[in-house]
């Protein structure tokens, strides 16, 4: 299993993944990012969605790169620090002894 896969599995099992996700959602709401992305989606739909041929997939493809660049550096740094803390905890945990039956 890859390191990222192991971290992903660990965070799911310990509940840290949902904590990280909740932290991200609250920080993005606090800084106005969600409102900004919502407005961006509305504007794109008004420009391109008049004939109903613009799909959700197309909207996501257009908005995602722009939305990622709008995430404040402070939010990115805070999440990175949280993930590093989790990784440190993983490294510091003693390995469970194997059953030698």
Curated annotation (Swiss-Prot):
Domain of life where this protein originates: Eukaryota
Tissue: Ubiquitous.
Cellular component aspect of the GO annotation: chromatin; cytoplasm; DUBm complex; nuclear membrane; nuclear periphery; nuclear pore; nucleoplasm; nucleus
First-listed, main subcellular location of the protein, grouped into a coarse class: nucleus
Location(s) in or outside the cell: Nucleus, Nucleoplasm; Cytoplasm; Nucleus membrane; Nucleus
Membrane-protein topology: Peripheral membrane protein
GO BP annotations, alphabetical order: heterochromatin boundary formation; mRNA export from nucleus; poly(A)+ mRNA export from nucleus; positive regulation of DNA-templated transcription; positive regulation of transcription by RNA polymerase II; regulation of transcription by RNA polymerase II; transcription elongation by RNA polymerase II
Any single Pfam family the record assigns to this protein: EnY2
Gene3D superfamilies associated with the record: 1.10.246.140
Molecular function GO labels: C2H2 zinc finger domain binding; chromatin binding; chromatin insulator sequence binding; TFIID-class transcription factor complex binding; transcription coactivator activity
Keywords from the UniProt entry: Activator, Chromatin regulator, Cytoplasm, Membrane, Nucleus, Transcription, Transcription regulation
Keyword Transcription regulation tagged: yes
Family statement: Belongs to the ENY2 family.
HAMAP family: ENY2_Sus1
Record note on quaternary structure: Component of the nuclear pore complex (NPC)-associated TREX-2/AMEX complex (anchoring and mRNA export complex), composed of e(y)2, xmas and PCID2. Within the TREX-2/ AMEX complex, interactions with xmas is required for localization to the nuclear periphery. Component of the SAGA transcription coactivator-HAT complexes, at least composed of Ada2b, e(y)2, Pcaf/Gcn5, Taf10 and Nipped-A/Trrap. Within the SAGA complex, e(y)2, Sgf11, and not/nonstop form an additional subcomplex of SAGA called the DUB module (deubiquitination module).
Biological role stated in the UniProt entry: Involved in mRNA export coupled transcription activation by association with both the TREX-2/AMEX and the SAGA complexes. The SAGA complex is a multiprotein complex that activates transcription by remodeling chromatin and mediating histone acetylation and deubiquitination. Within the SAGA complex, participates in a subcomplex that specifically deubiquitinates histone H2B. The SAGA complex is recruited to specific gene promoters by activators, where it is required for transcription. Required for nuclear receptor-mediated transactivation.
Protein name: Enhancer of yellow 2 transcription factor
Lineage: Eukaryota, Metazoa, Ecdysozoa, Arthropoda, Hexapoda
């Amino acid at each position: 299993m890859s390191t990222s896969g192991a971290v992903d599995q660990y965070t799911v099992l310990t509940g840290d993944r949902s904590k990280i996700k909740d932290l991200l959602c609250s920080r993005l709401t606090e800084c106005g990012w969600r409102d900004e992305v919502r407005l961006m989606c509305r504007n794109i739909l008004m420009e391109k969605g008049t004939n109903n041929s613009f799909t959700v997939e197309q909207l996501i493809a257009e908005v995602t790169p722009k939305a990622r660049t709008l995430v404040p550096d402070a939010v990115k740094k805070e999440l990175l620090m949280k993930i590093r803390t989790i990784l440190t905890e993983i490294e510091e945990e003693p390995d469970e002894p194997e059953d030698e039956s």
